[in-house]
Amino acid sequence: MKWNKYSIQTTTDAVDMISSALNDIGIEGIEIEDNVQLTKEEAKSMFVDFIPDLPPDDGRAKVNFYIDSEEDDGSMLEKVKAELEDLRMFIDIGEGTITESETEDKDWINNWKQYWHTFTIGDLFIKPTWEPETEEMKGHAVLSIDPGTAFGTGSHETTRMVIKQLQKYVKDGDEVLDVGCGSGILSVVALKYGAKHAFGTDLDPNAIIASEENAEQNNIDKKQLEVIEGNIIDDKAVKDACGYECYDIVCANILADVLEPLSTCIHEHMKHGAYFITSGIIDTKENEVAEAFKKNPELEIVEINHDGEWVNITARRK
């Protein structure tokens, strides 16, 4: 099936009104393109591999919608133009021009799989669930994940750096805390390298489901990995559930703006001599996060690593 894609050139202030108008005339599946930065609250709730730094918001935006090319007789486009003219009477919609292009409907659910194959980080093999284990993998740790459902796949620089640090610092029998655990793959990796138990926290309830699925896929006993929803920074119930001074390793692959307040209190959950492994830090935020770590007298930075424009900071509790 082919689709006609229409893009309305407008302003960020007009996006909501235009989207509502399109919905009112029967258009669904609206797509918005802009450079509006996330608020701090929005950022805290997003636990993906990374969030790219956008160019400055210049007030411009695109609202895209799609019409089946076989059913597109031009009548819907005329309705859209009429709606835009009506909106001009009340708000500034900017250019309000519409450009057209054609796109082909593909099996997006499965076609991307042809580009995703097994890769390694150190001696860890990370493979998609549809690929079998090979002779080469025998005797090595293997992480099997479904990239279609996981929050993070391990391929991004931030995740890769944390995994390398886990390979370096995890010891047999360790207790691990995974803050902002997302898909739980860092916890699963730690368990594969000898950790006894991992406890994860995340603001997104879907993280619990994703972590459970990844644990099951990797033959991790349910008792070895626990995940709860909540904010470890300021929710006492979550802090109590995690426990105090009981972790050998704490990992957090989250945004710099969250790592800064986390660094003021994370030592409460760490044993003396435990490691705090972090990433999700864009290089422009490195000094800011490092200074936040240094302000906590309980922590000392032992490593700072770079991969592309991303940074890992590993600290130890004194």
Curated annotation (Swiss-Prot):
<protein>
    <recommendedName>
        <fullName>Ribosomal protein L11 methyltransferase</fullName>
        <ecNumber>2.1.1.-</ecNumber>
    </recommendedName>
</protein>
<dbReference type="GO" id="GO:0032259">
    <property type="term" value="P:methylation"/>
</dbReference>
<feature type="binding site">
    <location>
        <position position="159"/>
    </location>
    <ligand>
        <name>S-adenosyl-L-methionine</name>
    </ligand>
</feature>
<dbReference type="GO" id="GO:0005737">
    <property type="term" value="C:cytoplasm"/>
</dbReference>
<keyword id="KW-0489">Methyltransferase</keyword>
<dbReference type="InterPro" id="IPR029063">
    <property type="entry name" value="SAM-dependent_MTases_sf"/>
</dbReference>
<comment type="similarity">
    <text>Belongs to the methyltransferase superfamily. PrmA family.</text>
</comment>
<comment type="function">
    <text>Methylates ribosomal protein L11.</text>
</comment>
<feature type="binding site">
    <location>
        <position position="180"/>
    </location>
    <ligand>
        <name>S-adenosyl-L-methionine</name>
    </ligand>
</feature>
<dbReference type="Pfam" id="PF06325">
    <property type="entry name" value="PrmA"/>
</dbReference>
<feature type="binding site">
    <location>
        <position position="253"/>
    </location>
    <ligand>
        <name>S-adenosyl-L-methionine</name>
    </ligand>
</feature>
<dbReference type="GO" id="GO:0016279">
    <property type="term" value="F:protein-lysine N-methyltransferase activity"/>
</dbReference>
<keyword id="KW-0808">Transferase</keyword>
<keyword id="KW-0963">Cytoplasm</keyword>
<keyword id="KW-0949">S-adenosyl-L-methionine</keyword>
<dbReference type="InterPro" id="IPR050078">
    <property type="entry name" value="Ribosomal_L11_MeTrfase_PrmA"/>
</dbReference>
<feature type="binding site">
    <location>
        <position position="202"/>
    </location>
    <ligand>
        <name>S-adenosyl-L-methionine</name>
    </ligand>
</feature>
<dbReference type="InterPro" id="IPR004498">
    <property type="entry name" value="Ribosomal_PrmA_MeTrfase"/>
</dbReference>
